[in-house]
Amino acid sequence: MKPRSANSPVLLEVKNFLASCKNVKSGIIVGVSGGVDSIGLAHALACQIKKETVSKLIVAHVNHASRGAENDADQAFVRLFIEKLQEATDTLVEFKTIKLNPDELNVGASWEKNARLARYNWFSDLALECKANWVFTAHTSNDQAETVLMRILRGSGVQGLAGIKPKRSLIRGVGLGRPLLFCSKEQICAYLRDNNIVWREDPSNQQTRFLRNKIRLDLLPLLKNEYQPAIEGILSGLAGHIHAYSSLEKRLARKIGLKLEKPRVLDQVVLDRLALSKFPNWKLSLFLRSLFARELWPIDAIHHKQWKKIAHNMAADGFEVHLAGGIRIQSNRYTVVLGPT
């Protein structure tokens, strides 16, 4: 398959990203909603993948069932797109889909978080089922800018301000990659138009009841028009700089963990309560954020002040707090136990 825009930044980013990934031979899963970003990623991957390096491309579509017939139309669109992609490329392209229960997504405070968790849980299961070592999602530099701004508003620490990582572990043996993280939505739109490829628009992206949408539709345009036209690039670049700095924090957090962590009990992390008193609160706060990231526990919903409060109080006898995602921190006589309830 030869795209018309061979020198497109989209193709170059995907090509370089693939070259940086290990263990891709067994196949790559790519999440495709039908929107511009994911359609662009799937098409670029199909153009760049070679049989000798990647055996198959698995397109994974999640039907959230939140918009009824529109969700079903998205699913049908992606299926047809994949059929055309299969015809135009030598790469084996498989289609996988799941329909979620909308009632389960409406439980608790955030539909967005429930939907995201459901998606990534399914991606994890699918990776194990298909024996794929990588799951790719179509996050862009625009998403990065929104994420950094959202986390600034929530008072995130340094690791939070590093934004979306280009690569991270999804589950043991499976990586989560964002090949388009340094491409803008405008570049992806141009790439698809050059290749006469259409995509679907999700009307829920215009609903400002979701914080990310409100930032994208209201706050970022205000900052761009009134203060700094290049604000998205600046925020995305800031995330890159902080990501480099956060690696130093991670090393420090690991050293702290070696002195605090005791043998875990199933899914519970156990800390030496007496050893906690040897560390200042800022180091404990840093360690906790690193621990939550490592364990894949919800981290974005916890504000900077809450991290400080927990670090200050967690060594106190009888301390207990319940956090987002069902995570509990409980202080006992000699230990502090953290984990799902």
How should each PLM-predicted stretch be described?
Residues 2-37, 53-54, 58, 62, ...:
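AMP-forming adenylation/ATP pyrophosphatase catalytic core
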Residues 222-234:
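Inter-helical turn/loop segments and adjacent helix faces that build the functional surface
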Residues 202-206, 229-232, 301:
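Short, surface-exposed loop/turn segments at secondary-structure junctions
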Residues 187, 231, 303-306:
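Single-residue recognition of alpha-helix capping/boundary positions
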